[in-house]
Amino acid sequence: MSRVNPLSSLSLLAALVLAGCSSQAPQPLKKGEKAIDVASVVRQKMPASVKDRDAWAKDLATTFESQGLAPTLENVCSVLAVAQQESNYQVDPAVPGLSKIAWQEIDRRAERMHIPAFLVHTALKIKSPNGKSYSERLDSVRTEKQLSAIFDDLISMVPMGQTLFGSLNPVRTGGPMQVSIAFAEQHTKGYPWKMDGTVRQEVFSRRGGLWFGTYHLLNYPASYSAPIYRFADFNAGWYASRNAAFQNAVSKASGVKLALDGDLIRYDSKEPGKTELATRKLAGKLGMSDSEIRRQLEKGDSFSFEETALYKKVYQLAEAKTGKSLPREMLPGIQLESPKITRNLTTAWFAKRVDERRARCMKQ
């Protein structure tokens, strides 16, 4: 997904108007749960070695209050588990080999646009707003926050930067929970603090990274039986675990083997993807047209998909064919791809690791 770098003036105005004035009534507690004091639990659960532990506690307490989240041990430990997994509680974690990754991205863009590398490297020797050349800053960059700032300057100040990147900053995630910047830009409503800059810059702060990361993890309705499926969704996108289970049902009913990745349609095209084509094979039994199937699959990024006729009928067909009840939640089978990842990792691996951390947190 492309990430728009500057926050539009309209979004900024909305964020400023909403800042500091939006608390919601907390979500109802589940049976057997009890409310906790979020700040006290964070101070208790975070290692004493964490810098600004008190500030983390206050920011997370404000996050829970402003988003109306149920203040439970499971929810707090879930957020802490993601932050520990993603950054080891560092607001702006260092990324090994980030300078090399950045230069490779620049060279890749130049090659794609048929611009000689030496021209690009020469252009980057000019002085940037902080007094150092862009080359010097790229050579010494250690964190995504630093790299994002370099690209912001490069895009806004240097014609070559605009040629290579347009208005799109290639740094796509940030902060202590490594939340998507595009996601944050789309979910500013209710943000409780005044923003001094863009949403992108806010994501790289402790409070912003926690607020948007927690929103992505907990602030959507789901029918999951365990937190591990939210952890998978955090990595793969909202409802990926539910949608992977639905793909499994489509596969059982149609006989078509599908990748259980949680993507029900092609979001980059109106052309049908493999899941949509497999579902179309069931059109006669479903009593639905191709266009009806498409319209209902498009609800796959919302909770309401579970209430569609398509969702219910596919499970009826699949369970009748297999003679057994099928799961409504599955860990998606997605290979994690990023220049920062040097091992063979999957969404399921991520979800299980985070869930182990959550369980340890709750037992402490």
What residue ranges belong to the model's regions?
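Cell-wall glycan-active module
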Residues: 2-4, 16, 20-364
